[in-house]
Amino acid sequence: MLKCIPLWRCNRHVESVDKRHCSLQVVPEEIYRYSRSLEELLLDANQLRELPKPFFRLLNLRKLGLSDNEIQRLPPEVANFMQLVELDVSRNDIPEIPESIKFCKALEIADFSGNPLSRLPDGFTQLRSLAHLALNDVSLQALPGDVGNLANLVTLELRENLLKSLPASLSFLVKLEQLDLGGNDLEVLPDTLGALPNLRELWLDRNQLSALPPELGNLRRLVCLDVSENRLEELPVELGGLALLTDLLLSQNLLQRLPEGIGQLKQLSILKVDQNRLCEVTEAIGDCENLSELILTENLLTALPHSLGKLTKLTNLNVDRNHLEVLPPEIGGCVALSVLSLRDNRLAVLPPELAHTAELHVLDVAGNRLRSLPFALTHLNLKALWLAENQAQPMLRFQTEDDAQTGEKVLTCYLLPQQPLPSLEDAGQQSSPSESCSDAPLSRVSVIQFEDTLEGEEDAEEAAAEKRGLQRRATPHPSELKVMKRGIEERRNEAFVCKPDPSPPSPSEEEKRLSAESALSGGSVPSASTASEGEPEILPAEVQGLGQHEAMPAQEEYTEDDYNEPTVHFAEDTLIPREDGESEEGQPEAAWPLPSGRQRLIRKDTPHYKKHFKISKLPQPEAVVALLQGVQTDREGPTAGWHNGPHTPWAPRAHEEEEEEEEENRDEEEGEATTEEDDKEEAVASAPSVKGVSFDQANNLLIEPARIEEEELTLTIVRQTGGLGISIAGGKGSTPYKGDDEGIFISRVSEEGPAARAGVRVGDKLLEVNGVALQDAEHHEAVEALRGAGAAVQMRVWRERMVEPENAVTITPLRPEDDYSPREWRGGGLRLPLLQPETPVSLRQRHAACLVRSEKGLGFSIAGGKGSTPYRAGDGGIFISRIAEGGAAHRAGTLQVGDRVLSINGVDMTEARHDHAVSLLTAASPTISLLLERETGGTYPPSPPPHSSPTPAATVAATVSTAVPGEPLLPRLSPSLLATALEGPYPVEEICLPRAGGPLGLSIVGGSDHSSHPFGVQDPGVFISKVLPRGLAARCGLRVGDRILAVNGQDVREATHQEAVSALLRPCLELCLLVRRDPPPPGMRELCIQKAPGEKLGISIRGGAKGHAGNPCDPTDEGIFISKVSPTGAAGRDGRLRVGLRLLEVNQQSLLGLTHAEAVQLLRSVGDTLTVLVCDGFDTSTTTALEVSPGVIANPFAAGLGHRNSLESISSIDRELSPEGPGKEKELASQALPWESESAETTGRNLEPLKLDYRALAALPSAGSLQRGPSATTGGKTTEAPCSPGSQQTKPGVIQPLAQAWPRNSPAPRGRGGPCSPPSPDELPANVKQAYRAFAAVPTVHPPENSATQPPTPGPAASPEQLSFRERQKYFELEVRVPQAEGPPKRVSLVGADDLRKMQEEEARKLQQKRAQMLREEAVTSGPDMGLASDRESPDDQQEAEQPWAVPSHAGGSSPSSPPPLGGNAPVRTAKAERRHQERLRMQSPELPAPERALSPAERRALEAEKRALWRAARMKSLEQDALRAQMVLSKSQEGRGKRGPLERLAEAPSPAPTPSPTPLEDFGLQTSASPGRLPLSGKKFDYRAFAALPSSRPVYDIQSPDFVEELRTLEASPSPGSQEEDGEVALVLLGRPSPGAVGPEDMTLCSSRRSVRPGRRGLGPVPS
């Protein structure tokens, strides 16, 4: 609709205005401006009260909407709307329609509904154009007699009026299609109603019709007929003439049968005949072939017609609440049936043909008498099968059985057979007060009503409750009934007693009672006990208040529903006390003294064992006297009965505390939620008052509590980085922490926090903090006061202290066998209880514990008690809920999680409140004596419903010291296993977990084939690595670190990991674990680190499963360790995480068994809060040689990690990944060692140049701090060092011989972590080539093992001596790197900026030291007898000469040549030098043999060739290092001219960016006997002649191994920007002297391999100088 906004000079030709829902109170003025053009005006849903006269000038209106207004008068001017077609004035206050309405001749649609009209004007029938007229709810009492003049009417709505008759002229409305007469007072319909030929819908519901005229059968076009809610007793047979009828609604009438003609309604689709009096359904119903919905609810049908099977289109059949006794087998013909509801009938069996209804999805047979279901129903695809009224789940689990009567296979479940429920006609017949309790009202209610029952059986307490209208609801008790409870508590103190039963019931009455109670039990297993005459009966508790609809559905709920509330179950049968005090059901019950004929109702709950005390144990005579007087009081008087309630074990304050409002337990240390206070509606025995003692209803001795005194303390806490270590609760306006006190209380104290060390305890009331009073403060004020208190917090607290009563009775701790049996009265007027031994089926044993309070407290937590969440469902006792590791309770070893606390320091705790127990435990007493009750192996209590929470989680056997005498500790285990288990140093326990279908809540690690680190490092096994906080294992008392010895008797000490998992997952009703309480890993603790917004965590990790070991001291350890802590991250700021710690869990996610990548991903996904469980890992002091700077573990490329996965074994958690992601990193790592896949037998391969980026190498640690694990390459396979890198610590600068690098097949000793001793000469490699390769100064290649016996012969063609100068010059040219066209890829930062700065500082310092040292050595090493060769020798050569040269002989096993003496000042670089050296050796040690004499001439020539090659290589290296030094001088000079040098550019670079080499890393491919290729480093070409003449300078060591170069190769990612701009920049690295562990089998030189060198020559020829 167009809404016109009147603007200046706007177009006023507006045809439609919509002002609905505009809250208009008057008609807008602008509407009048459009009087010439406006045709549609909608003013509905406003607040118009009148229509002004200008309104009726809108003469062109065709549609007017005025509904939902407050118009009180329709003016006669409405006649002006001559062109009006549609008028809607519904839902106004118009009392009458003006007579002038007749002039609106064009009116076709009129709606006057919802107005207080009482009549229509006489001229109304002149509106002959009217087609749709609505007069609903207008209080019409009669229609105009000439209503037939409205000949064009199509729709006439007259619902909700006061019509009692219809005019005969109604039949003239020949165009009428819809007539609605519902909700009137019609009693008779005119016969002329059948003369409406076009009528399609006729609504006659909610009238007073008692019959329908037969003429209705003439309405041939009628589609819908609704005559529901009338008084029809029968239908006319002519109704079958309605050939087009589809909907026939006959609900709520008095029909007793359906006419036979109903079968003629071939188009009938919906037939509703519910709430009638049908006794049968005609067989003609089967002819309604299109019938899809048939509703026959609430009739008197006893059977269904057999023709029902013809209804092939029937989808919904509802026959609820009838008297059906059998279902016709023909129902299987309803193939389209999807919903079949047969609820509340009398069906005893279902026909198997029902399975033919293939589309059946919902079957409701609740409230019948079915014994079983036909097995054929399994063929149906049922979505819901309802067997009971309150069935919790739509589908159940069925079992197959054989029918005892027919022998056929049937389906059954726990809801079958069904219990019959009374029919509805019995609902009004209430039982009289004298009838049995089984005749309870039948209507199901949501509460248990305490109503009139047998007077002789009704307690006074229950009578009082009934008079007050008390309704007992499901536990927990609603808070709104607390006030009502106080009234009952007052009546308890008046010692109401029960009236004795005047006469015992007859056996027939007993049978009725038992049968009624059996019906109430709803599916429980019947007991075999029978009632015997003359013996007192104990009837089920509170049956009076339980309707018969209540118990069975409740049982169904608890069995099927996933969540089960704590329930109270009722005893099904009478419990007959026997002589030994045990009931027929096998549960120990007290044989209480019941008067003759007295019948008691016992509430059967979770079995509890009576805490009786023996008379012999009472230490004081007044306690004995009080006990005897209490018994006499019970027996006094002719009507003395047995009292029914528990005695409150507290002094006068007990009632006040029980009547307190529901309070919320805010003690976070116990971790228990809130619940309402437990309630027992039983009377209290009025025992005489004896100071110090009292009694409960069974005359059990109860010790009164100690007196509570309050003291004020002033404590000072020094705040630390982690806070104060306390939590507070309460405050003004908050939920009180204790009672009604709105003060601030300490709710939690961290065990090792500053507050605990200062003496703060849980329960202290906070009065003042640093002078700020907190008595009436709100919670947030207290929080702000604590936060702003500064470093030293001085607080004033109020603490409660227990003072023992004057005549307190102290109880001797009971031994486990001193459990108490029920008492019986024998002899005369007063009989003492007979003490009998406990029955052998006892599930519990008692033991005493005495704990000495430490500075950290007692070390355990309690849960349960009144006023707190029950630790176990339905059990209000106090239990040990947690034992702190290392606390007093843990060290004592006498407490276990789940132990019930019976008394604390002699004060009974069986019915105590939670806060009382806390007060006793936090008292000032240094020692605490506990009497505990522990569940032991044996029969279990009645199993709770599945998934009930929480349940008694396990039955934990006591340790040997507290076991029951004469009872085997672990009966399921073999004696050998038990003996072996008990021999260990740690306690062994058997823990049983009831399997209820849910998870165990634990994870294991270890096994004979898996590492179990950090558990059992020295003694591997299967360990519990994770326990879910509230899982089944945690409730059983299992802890992290427990060693599993056996699972259900199966020994798993030597089992594999998978076998242990299979044993734990094996289906069984109960899982019994034999565990040994091994101590947890040392240093295990949980740390919480908070990250600031945008702050990085700042740690790096190493290790992981299926990768490189993160523990350098143990290569088998697959744990995750912290390898670096950045001082700028959150971890460095926190200060508790340090290098070497092992990570066990991150945010409750275990890291055990995760790969390195998974651990990195998990750590990177944490939010702002990191909760990490750590323990001690490796000692960083033993791996100091691996560190390049403080707090940084050495780079894996330099730390002897020589594995392909070295790159993947250390990751920074805060590293920004490249766009390529981890896949790119893995690709780089996978390309690191391509030479491994090459054949070692390929010869003549060119060693292509290796391009090393200067920046990448300069960022690596210097050789002075470089640790290289010794490695030997054999046959193309890299072998690991025989010992850990940390075991090789020698002076920097000394090149270790090859003796430390052993192949795996060598006899070198391999000990874990042991020192690597130098080998003996016999253990040296036999191959001469291998020996020389170990010390060659040029990089060589390793021949395969099968070439050991083939010494190389010099090839003359390839000899460097035969090459020209220019050909030799090519070896010394540096290759110019051509920049790549494409842009550099994204760098991956491997070294942080702070680490790079530390490396550079350390490098500069070491270079300074080396320069000074070399200058000093140069003067010493120069001598006159050096000759020409010595002129070129440098201190580097002397260092090499100082090494013990081992020259092994041929494979024959000859001893190596003697090494030169240490400290010799003549390096062996020439033949003359060697002769001089040998002369000195002969002079010093004449007995040394000459190994060369044993060599053949060919071998001697080969050896000489090797020596010469070695010497030439040393000279070439000296020249090359001089050239490098010169280049550095040039770079320094350029730096003075404003250009930056490589070191400065490296320092400014954010991270070392390795440069990718265009050549594959096949430079180090293993070849049979290829010449050593020179490895040119990328840079610009420099002519050898340009720098060969430069003066010799201090050389730079560059001793590396091929695998080291290979690792460096993986660093290459992109050329550094500007790296090619500088003159003289070469890709070299200043590595200083090698580390002790850096045994380089070859040296990397600066030579270029431009051509193949023939095999057999190991070096270069002499270079002309």
Swiss-Prot record:
One GO BP annotation of this record: activation of GTPase activity
Ranges of Basic and acidic residues composition bias in the record: 479-494, 570-580, 1213-1228, 1364-1376, 1394-1406, 1471-1482, 1534-1547
Gene Ontology cellular component terms for the protein in this record: adherens junction; apical plasma membrane; basolateral plasma membrane; cell-cell contact zone; cell-cell junction; cytoplasm; cytosol; extrinsic component of postsynaptic density membrane
Regions annotated as coiled coil: 455-475, 653-687, 1390-1421
Annotated stretches, region: Sufficient for targeting to adherens junction and to inhibit cell proliferation: 1-804
Residues covered by region (Required for interaction with VIM): 714-1180
Modified positions (Omega-N-methylarginine) in chain numbering: R1312
Residue ranges with Polar residues bias: 428-437, 1264-1277
Tissue specificity field: Expressed in CD4+ T-cells (at protein level). Found in a wide range of tissues including liver, kidney and spleen. Also expressed in the brain (at protein level).
Listed PANTHER family: DISCS LARGE, PROTEIN SCRIBBLE HOMOLOG
Role this protein plays: Scaffold protein involved in different aspects of polarized cell differentiation regulating epithelial and neuronal morphogenesis and T-cell polarization. Via its interaction with CRTAM, required for the late phase polarization of a subset of CD4+ T-cells, which in turn regulates TCR-mediated proliferation and IFNG and IL22 production. Plays a role in cell directional movement, cell orientation, cell sheet organization and Golgi complex polarization at the cell migration front. Promotes epithelial cell layer barrier function via maintaining cell-cell adhesion.
Note: The circletail (Crc) mice exhibit craniorachischisis, a severe form of neural tube defect. This is due to a single base insertion in the Scrib gene creating a frameshift which leads to synthesis of a truncated protein.
Protein name, per record: Protein scribble homolog
Organism: Mus musculus (Mouse)
